[in-house]
Amino acid sequence: MKTLFKSLKITLVFCVFFSVFYILILWLFAQVAGPNKGNAEVATLDGKVVGAANVGQMFTKDIYFWGRPSCAGDGYDASSSSGSNKGPTNPEYLAEVEARIDTFLVHHPYLSRKDVPAEMVTASASGLDPNITPQCAYVQVKRVAQARGLTENQVKEIVDQSVEKPLLGIFGTEKINVLKLNIALEENK
């Protein structure tokens, strides 16, 4: 009985610590050291809020760069954030990827199947990835330039300016925030 009470006390202490104090410590750390004090990075265009730069959004028009596909609900539904949990041999998953490849090729007829980046046809683990690699942006330059009536060099220059380097030059890879890139395109009018 003595052991049971000790176990219950320890369990209670850990429950309180991890459900209150640990979360409070993380929140305080984010407020002090985190970007934007731990809050969403709000993106604006013409003084209006158009989204949060740290949450992926669906772009389907040819005048915009597209992000990774989402398996979070019906198109980037943050309340349904999760991966699909479908393995690479799952027939349903393979059919989804094939359909995404076909759709991508319809909008990018100058590409062959082997030129379609895997990242553009497979969903991220969270389903809300806001970033793509520079390679994914460069394969879309021609489509976006044609749809906007710009030269490929003009669009490529905007892409080049949107590349974010790895943290401290070593942590992570180069990436492009799709929302910020599309805002830069809109501001370039």
Swiss-Prot record:
Bilayer topology term: Single-pass membrane protein
Keyword rRNA-binding: no
UniProt-recorded Gene Ontology molecular function terms: ATP binding; P-type potassium transmembrane transporter activity
Main location: membrane
Nucleotide-binding listed as a keyword: yes
Chain ranges passing through the membrane: 10-30
Keywords: ATP-binding, Cell inner membrane, Cell membrane, Ion transport, Membrane, Nucleotide-binding, Potassium, Potassium transport, Transmembrane, Transmembrane helix, Transport
GO cellular component, one term: plasma membrane
Domain of life: Bacteria
Signal sequence annotation: none
Gene Ontology biological process terms in this record: potassium ion transmembrane transport
InterPro entries, per database record: KdpC
Subcellular localization(s) per the UniProt record: Cell inner membrane
Subunit structure and binding partners: The system is composed of three essential subunits: KdpA, KdpB and KdpC.
Main function: Part of the high-affinity ATP-driven potassium transport (or Kdp) system, which catalyzes the hydrolysis of ATP coupled with the electrogenic transport of potassium into the cytoplasm. This subunit acts as a catalytic chaperone that increases the ATP-binding affinity of the ATP-hydrolyzing subunit KdpB by the formation of a transient KdpB/KdpC/ATP ternary complex.
Entry similarity comment: Belongs to the KdpC family.
Protein name: Potassium-transporting ATPase KdpC subunit
Lineage, opening ranks: Bacteria, Pseudomonadati, Bacteroidota, Bacteroidia, Bacteroidales
